[in-house]
Amino acid sequence: MEHYISLFVRAVFVENMALAFFLGMCTFLAVSKKVSTAFGLGIAVTLVLGISVPVNNLVYNLILRDGALVEGVDLSFLNFITFIGVIAALVQILEMILDRFFPSLYNALGIFLPLITVNCAIFGGVSFMVQRDYNFAESVVYGFGSGTGWMLAIVAMAGIREKLKYANVPAGLRGLGITFITTGLMALGFMSFSGVQL
């Protein structure tokens, strides 16, 4: 149990998708203007990561890995296209659920909801799972931990950006300039967790 808690904490803080690997920055910067919208997208990304990493773990271990289906047959060259297909299917299901049950969040996320399919944080989580050879339980913990870390980063950024609206920011730094500086400072803060041994 301690191993899984350590893996979750490491995925949230030490190996944060947004602030350690800078993955998913397009939606991170575009949707982090309001806390409510950022939280909604963070939940969506967490759900997609939390489901797609273990599902892709099963697909990889039962079908694509060398010798999984038939001894001597290696289908690992299909990794990328298969993983993207699974992620796209999960995002479409999530989009239908949000449209049906949470129309205000669906409208607030707009074009960024289908873009979760090509969000490199999602694909990065799946790729790290394969690279690190996680088992199914580890991939569940890692998927939800990575999503939680990304959500924590985007909600914190949205909170800071809401406060920056009332700050006296120099004219040359208004907008994305101060946002990039803030992201860098947040990344430095999260970098302090890198020395923590769990």
From Swiss-Prot:
HAMAP family: NqrE. One of its GO terms (biological process) is respiratory electron transport chain. Composed of six subunits; NqrA, NqrB, NqrC, NqrD, NqrE and NqrF. It catalyses: a ubiquinone + n Na(+)(in) + NADH + H(+) = a ubiquinol + n Na(+)(out) + NAD(+). It comes from the Bacteria. It is a multi-pass membrane protein. Belongs to the NqrDE/RnfAE family. This is Na(+)-translocating NADH-quinone reductase subunit E. Its EC number is 7.2.1.1. The chain crosses the membrane at residues 11-31, 35-55, 77-97, 110-130, 140-160, 176-196. The keyword Metal-binding does not apply. Keywords: Cell inner membrane, Cell membrane, Ion transport, Membrane, NAD, Sodium, Sodium transport, Translocase, Transmembrane, Transmembrane helix, Transport, Ubiquinone. NQR complex catalyzes the reduction of ubiquinone-1 to ubiquinol by two successive reactions, coupled with the transport of Na(+) ions from the cytoplasm to the periplasm. NqrA to NqrE are probably involved in the second step, the conversion of ubisemiquinone to ubiquinol. GO terms for cellular component: Gram-negative-bacterium-type cell wall; plasma membrane. InterPro entries: NqrDE/RnfAE, NqrDE/RnfAE_oxidrdctase, NqrE. It is found in: Cell inner membrane. GO terms for molecular function: oxidoreductase activity, acting on NAD(P)H, quinone or similar compound as acceptor. It comes from Serratia proteamaculans (strain 568).
